[in-house]
Design a protein with these regions (language model features):
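Solvent-exposed, non-transmembrane regions of integral membrane proteins
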Residues: 1-830
Length: 830
């Protein structure tokens, strides 16, 4: 059957190149393997040449697949399920790339693209290590190609093809309108592409419609992909039994991987800070943790590699750390994409990701089991110096620091893997007769504190070690030399810490941790300052000011600033939006929001918020995204020195779902940020006011009844002084002071105003929002009576409920990330 309006050529080319990439990567793997195993240079050279052609072909195919998929998405070819599922016509062009990584297929493709880039460089740069290293990378490419091939083997689906058409996907099978005669057992209509629901796509997840999500995933995936290079070198060393020589070639690659992966992780933190509404940048989310763990182990591996380079110690540990860093990249992929995390993560893929459960387990097994077999088989042959390191040597304390990083990673991944542990125990309970297998391990009630109470001590130890260790020499250090070098930085650090702790008002108190946890926070801040000052001083004391040779010290300065920024911004985070309006908006029991920490702003009414007067001025709808609204919140400092506008936004009833999806906004200063996001809005369809005013002529002391109670006119005040009104001396104004008594016994005070300004009469109404009551003072009668207009409406007026924080010293964190990456890049270049 010929279907109308379909564009089949891009998909046909895409499927062709997927098959080519699958076959070419397998050929490259086999040919590189044969090159390594060849007994003579002639055979080895032949196989290597074939492998290169195959890998170049595979790379071209992957780039072509990427380009074709982008063509389909950008041209809104909704006959393809991937384009329909992840994009729409209203999507801004700058977010089209983000459609790639919303789905499984696109993110695996992005990973594969970076492997191609790395492999093409290594074909020239790896020299004699090319064949064994590229065997590993080519095999990884084969595994990734199976993720997008989308074929059935022995009744099991292998991968998910991004070029599947809507009519092939099964999506239309239960849609009667898409079938001939409205019969789902009949063929799909030839003109199904002209049906209304096929004219636009399902749209991109609103959380991904942010500029950070255009740049964060490519950087993060480059970091993930690059961890295969030190892994491949370690694997090659074990395979070729050339245990130490590979380290020199691997070091700059490991540094590159650490820098890019670290920046990618913190870009994710920046995205969370600007796009998510939990009021921060790190929540110990399982997927955040799963990306952090490979980085921690990679950093540990870099330091043990440096120990080996200078002393010959720790080569075995270096092999292990590089194997584990790549292994945990695969494991993090397993956690993210199989749905095993369920609703414990805001990042996790679900749905079709469940089909990858065994597929990714196989990938992990094929990659890691051979590596561990080689490691343990060659363990005794890996060079190891029998003599223990001296306690006064640099390598001893570097190893301790590496071990702390490793143990920190194990603790984090252990807590993160609770859903996996519960699933394993549940599976075993049907096989083994042990009662404890039926007991699921519950996550901690306060997840953030459960991590923080351990990681604060990791931060303290690492901060101290980064400050001290560079002042030690490899192999041995005399105490006289050490104390002479370290004395001045230590005195400066103690002085700085004393000033910060004495005058910095570090008052972070957690009810679970008590004053012991507060003391740990103080100690962590002091040690972070020590790391910054001691490493900055070492650039001049140890390196004589030669920045080109000081990459390690610069990276340590940056890392100290990261720790300091985290501790200061978290311990001094201040809620600004305490409820001063008297309007309480209830939250669901499942919400983490507290009514007293959220301020409700009625449109046009100024409210008190800390050091600011804030006013909800107006709102506007996004020109393309009709479900997205921007809300203009005016801030004015009470001392009159500054005023500014913040524009938090929210998606309202996205795809028919109730509630809102807020996007924060923030005002940046050198020493703090003001951070605002919306927590509640009236539903737009409920905000249409159809009620009308009813006039009441009354005198002071009279009573007016309304549905839920009554109100008494207490007095009429001439020329009232009120912050809400801005009258000049030439204006005339009267305010009616009214007390409202509800049936529930609650009292409210209203003060509507009648005024004459520039010879024009006007009025300012007042509301009792919780009573749906609006009162306007519209006229003064000759007999000392006044006319009040009263209205009861289910939509009194527009309002927003928001939460606002002050994040102090958040820029210390961002600066630390940049400086850390800069230091690592300097070390890599050196």
């Amino acid at each position: 059957m010929h279907y109308l309006d379909e564009h089949l050529l891009p998909g046909q080319f895409g499927r062709f190149f997927i098959v080519v990439s699958l076959i070419a990567s397998l050929v490259a793997t086999f040919a590189y393997f044969k090159s390594v195993q060849s007994k003579n240079d002639i055979d080895g050279g032949y196989w290597k040449k074939l492998a290169r052609y195959a890998f170049i072909t595979e790379s071209f195919s992957v780039f072509a697949i990427f380009g074709l998929l982008f063509y389909i998405i950008s041209n809104h070819l909704f006959e393809y399920k991937y384009a329909w599922q992840h994009s729409s016509r209203s999507l801004e062009p700058k977010y089209l790339l983000a459609c790639f990584w919303e789905g499984q297929e696109g993110s695996f493709l992005l990973w594969s693209v970076w492997h191609c880039v790395l492999g093409l460089i290594l074909m020239k740069a790896a020299k004699k290590w090319e064949a064994p290293v590229m065997t590993v990378i080519s095999f990884a490419q084969f595994c990734l190609a199976t993720m997008i091939v989308g074929i059935y083997l022995f009744g099991e689906k292998i991968g998910s093809n991004p070029f599947v058409l809507m009519r092939e996907s099964g999506f239309l099978d239960t849609t009667p309108i898409a079938h001939v005669g409205m019969d789902v057992s009949a063929p799909i209509r030839q003109d199904y592409m002209r049906l209304p629901f096929m004219q636009d796509g399902n749209d991109l997840n609103v959380l991904l419609q942010n500029y950070w999500m255009v740049i964060h995933p490519p950087v993060l995936f480059f970091g993930f992909a690059s961890t295969i290079v030190p892994f491949a070198f370690a694997f090659a060393g074990l395979w070729k039994k050339n245990f130490g020589e590979w380290t020199k070639m691997a070091l700059p690659w490991a540094l590159l991987s650490a820098a890019v992966l670290g920046v990618g992780i913190m870009m994710g933190a920046a995205w969370a800070y600007e796009s998510l509404s939990f009021g921060g940048y790190w929540a110990w989310d399982p997927v955040e943790n799963a990306s952090l763990v490979p980085w921690l182990i990679l950093i540990a591996g870099i330091h043990t590699l440096l120990i080996y380079k200078h002393t010959g110690h720790s080569l075995r540990t270096t092999h292990l750390f590089f194997i584990l860093s790549f292994g945990f990249v695969l494991y993090s992929t397993f956690l993210t994409r199989t749905g095993i995390l369920g609703d414990t993560s805001v990042h996790a893929f679900t749905g079709e990701g469940k089909s990858l459960f065994y597929h990714l387990q196989l990938f992990m097994g094929l990659a890691l089991i051979p590596a561990f077999i080689l490691f343990f088989r060659n363990y005794k042959d890996i060079p190891s110096i029998k003599q223990e390191e001296s306690g006064s040597s640099r390598e001893f304390w570097m190893f301790i620091g590496s071990l702390v990083f490793f143990l920190s990673a194990i603790v984090i991944i252990g807590k993160t893997s609770l859903p996996v542990l519960n699933k394993i125990m549940s599976s075993l309970s049907g096989i083994l007769p042990f009662k404890f297998l039926n007991r699921a391990v519950a996550p901690p009630e306060d997840q953030e504190f459960a991590y923080n109470q351990i990681q604060i001590f990791v931060a303290i130890i690492i901060a101290v070690l980064t400050g001290l260790t560079q002042y030690l020499k490899y192999k041995n250090t005399s105490s006289k030399f050490f104390w002479k070098q370290i004395l001045v930085p230590t005195i400066l650090s103690v002085a700085a810490a004393t000033l910060v702790l004495a005058f910095g008002d570090i008052n972070y108190y957690h009810p679970r941790g008590g004053y012991g946890f507060l003391a740990a926070i103080w100690l962590g801040i002091a040690c972070s300052l020590y790391a910054v000052i001691a490493n900055a001083a070492y650039i001049w004391i140890g390196m004589k000011g030669k920045l080109r040779l000081s990459g390690g010290s610069i990276a340590h300065v940056g890392f100290g600033l990261v720790l300091l920024g985290i501790l200061l911004s978290s311990s001094k985070k201040e809620i600004l939006s305490y409820n001063t309006s008297g309007i309480s908006i209830p939250f669901d029991a499942s919400s983490k929001e507290k009514t007293g920490e959220n301020l409700t702003l009625v449109k046009g009414v100024k409210n008190d918020m800390g050091r600011y007067w804030v006013t909800y001025e107006n709102d506007e709808q996004h020109p393309q995204k009709k479900e997205k609204w921007f809300f203009n919140i005016h801030f004015q400092r009470k001392d009159g020195k500054e005023e500014f506008m913040l524009r938090p936004s929210a998606y309202i009833k996205v795809k028919g779902n109730e509630g809102i999806q807020p996007e924060p906004d923030s005002r940046h200063y050198m020493d703090h940020d003001v951070f605002v996001y919306l927590t509640a809005l009236p539903a737009p369809e409920k905000n249409k006011d159809t009620a009308s005013f009813s006039p009441r002529t009354v005198a002071v002391g009279d009573t007016i009844f309304y549905t839920n109670g009554f109100m008494i006119i207490d007095k009429v005040v001439a020329n009232p002084s009120d912050e809400r009104y801005h009258f000049t001396r030439s204006d005339t104004a009267l305010a009616a002071d009214i007390t409202v008594f509800s049936k529930q016994g609650t009292r409210y005070h209203l003060r509507p105003v009648f005024y004459v300004k520039d010879n024009q009469a006007g009025y300012i109404l007042d509301t009792a929002l919780s009573q749906n009551l609006v009162v306007a003072f519209t006229q003064v009668m000759l007999d000392k009576k006044v006319v009040l207009q009263v209205k009861e409406s289910n939509s009194v007026m527009k309002y927003v409920t928001l939460k606002a924080y002050k994040f102090p010293f958040i820029n210390v964190l961002w600066a630390g990330i940049i400086i850390t990456a800069l230091g690592i890049f300097i070390s890599m270049a050196r």
